[in-house]
Amino acid sequence: MTPGNTYRNQPIAGALFVLGASFVFAMVGTLVKVVSTSLNNEMVVFFRNVCSLIFILPWLAYSRPSGGIKTTCLRLHLLRSASGLGAMYCFFYAIAQLRLSEAFLLFSTSPIFIPLIAYMWIREEVTYSSRWAIIAGFIGIVLILKPGYGIFRPAMLVALAGGFLAALAMVSIRRMSFSEPAIRIVFYFTIFSTVISAGPLSWSWRSPMPGIWWLLILIGLLAAVGQFFLTKGYSMAPAAQVGPLTYGNVVFATIIGWVFWGETMDYLTWVGAFLVCMAGIITTRRTGAHVLVDASVGKTPER
């Protein structure tokens, strides 16, 4: 657990909060897909960040983490913010270009990359079961991408890159997790990502239509709610118990995509999805890659 979190062993309540977060994240993706028909990716990313910042500031004031917002890990915060923001750009672009289920599925490959990045960066041992899970996960990725079948889309690689960048963000947080409470990590990410994502608006600004404003605000609100639900869930139950439930966002996204857009997946994608999800569950349980956090970027671990 991170500093400032009070742990209570309430697995059922924790599981419900994590499932709730998974559903909220799927709704964020759905709204991003809707507004992406009217706004460019740069606009959507910026408003997601600035709206989340508005809703997270009261949470920060309420939580009052020990030491306030003072940090000794500024470089790691910058790395986490750069990789997390890059993951967000990739994820939102993929949502606009791909089926909702495909975007979520490829972005959810991040737990497969975590052991590899952790080994190369902090020399964290990769367990035997994790090695086989990683191999199975990459086989699943190939089945989803289907290179050579004539139905490959470049946006799939963008979604996959988002998964890798999200994994890099998670390992960055792992490095900070013993000295930084979760709310401080979220605060710095939201501040940095809001400021950085404001830059591209100088050449990409388009005034949203009146109805779109409400959707952008709702995206930010839901992102903050999802953040809170995940934090609450992981304060009530061990990650090994509730971590696998974070893949519920793929299930919810698949259902939403089918209901609203008539999206379906072929049998190779279903097999690939099974392998990726199983690989992610195994590596999450084995490495302790807790998922705490950033609403639309996916997950950030704490220990």
Give residue ranges: language-model regions:
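Hydrophobic/small/kink-forming positions within alpha-helical transmembrane segments
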Residues: 22-30, 57, 81-89, 111-116, ...
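C-terminal transmembrane-helix exit sites in multi-pass transporters
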Residues: 91-93, 110-132, 251-270
